[in-house]
Amino acid sequence: MCGVRVAIVAESFLPQVNGVSNSVVKVLEHLRRTGHEALVIAPDTPPGEDRAERLHDGVRVHRVPSRMFPKVTTLPLGVPTFRMLRALRGFDPDVVHLASPALLGYGGLHAARRLGVPTVAVYQTDVPGFASSYGIPMTARAAWAWFRHLHRLADRTLAPSTATMESLIAQGIPRVHRWARGVDVQRFAPSARNEVLRRRWSPDGKPIVGFVGRLAPEKHVDRLTGLAASGAVRLVIVGDGIDRARLQSAMPTAVFTGARYGKELAEAYASMDVFVHSGEHETFCQVVQEALASGLPVIAPDAGGPRDLITPHRTGLLLPVGEFEHRLPDAVAHLVHERQRYALAARRSVLGRSWPVVCDELLGHYEAVRGRRTTQAA
């Protein structure tokens, strides 16, 4: 495919670090490496914070104002502006990539339609599920109505997992295709294991069970409280968020490291014995894939993205959502006992999922919507 001009309208981007921003960074790296041009449109930091970068690795980042909506998400949401349309028109894209579109993505979608540019909408965040976790089911219903309207206007919707595809199709969203996520198998690897770190976390030698992620209601980290209280393992929680103080109070024996990135994050994964993910509202669940790459057997709820990533009784265990807490201690004990067998299979299961391979698939989706528009125009 010859050089393509791709405008990425990202609902979240650096300095926010999450699944959406991380995947956008990987896509940008691949576009640059393969000779394509990019523009990013993303939220600025909220009022009162330092301005976010306007240039990322040579790629222009057009920032829009952001606002906080704490009853819907802990992340700032970008507000579409007319300047965004001007930025798109000036860049003259061949395709507009909508990364986890919500409010800003909706503005980007309409701007693209006004300019006659095809769109690929990447569904990455289970906002309806998050709303339910925050105890506001009416918002969940409204969110589905919003996403149905938005994605029906896109030329193609990409879902990261089979479960998410099925959910979107059940909601009446058309033209849904699967596009998974890659993983850096060089960075996330068993070789990153750090024995000094392990001794600091568990000086008495107890098996180390870890969680990595944002400490927010939708992650249901409180489901690990019983495991922490059992005393059979050392629970290590890597991440930060609005629930941290409450969780630390509920799990005084757990180790809370705060957020970790890069080499420190890779060492944290590899220094665990078993990985547990506690939330069921995951469209993909990149942390599970990173844990598998690190050679960890994984336990997760039998819902959403982890179903595509975990092979039960081979790379980990999927537990019924309603029985997760009850079954968790026995599941952990089993994986600790059989760790070596599971660890080898876990690592092997992700070796073919590198970011270059996955991003080449994305380029194919770009080409498909461009071809569809060309055919319609003819």
UniProtKB/Swiss-Prot annotation:
UniProt EC number: 2.4.1.-
Record bears the keyword Glycosyltransferase: yes
GO molecular function terms listed in the Swiss-Prot or TrEMBL record: hexosyltransferase activity; mannosyltransferase activity
Domain of life: Bacteria
The protein's annotated pathway: Phospholipid metabolism; phosphatidylinositol metabolism
SUPFAM superfamilies found in the cross-reference section: UDP-Glycosyltransferase/glycogen phosphorylase
Any one annotated GO CC term: membrane
Gene Ontology annotations of biological process type: glycolipid biosynthetic process; phosphatidylinositol metabolic process; phospholipid biosynthetic process
Cross-referenced CDD domains: GT4-like
Membrane-crossing residue ranges in chain numbering: none
Keywords (A to Z) from UniProt: Glycosyltransferase, Lipid biosynthesis, Lipid metabolism, Phospholipid biosynthesis, Phospholipid metabolism, Transferase, Virulence
InterPro entries per the UniProt record, alphabetical: Glyco_trans_1 (IPR001296), Glyco_trans_4-like_N (IPR028098), Glycosyltransferase_grp1 (IPR050194)
Function text: Catalyzes the addition of a mannose residue from GDP-D-mannose to GlcAGroAc2 to generate 1,2-di-O-C16/C18:1-(alpha-D-mannopyranosyl)-(1-4)-(alpha-D-glucopyranosyluronic acid)-(1-3)-glycerol(ManGlcAGroAc2).
Miscellaneous comment text of the record: Was identified as a high-confidence drug target.
Family in the record: Belongs to the glycosyltransferase group 1 family. Glycosyltransferase 4 subfamily.
PANTHER family xref list: SULFOQUINOVOSYL TRANSFERASE SQD2 (PTHR45947:SF3)
Protein name, as recorded: GDP-mannose-dependent alpha-mannosyltransferase
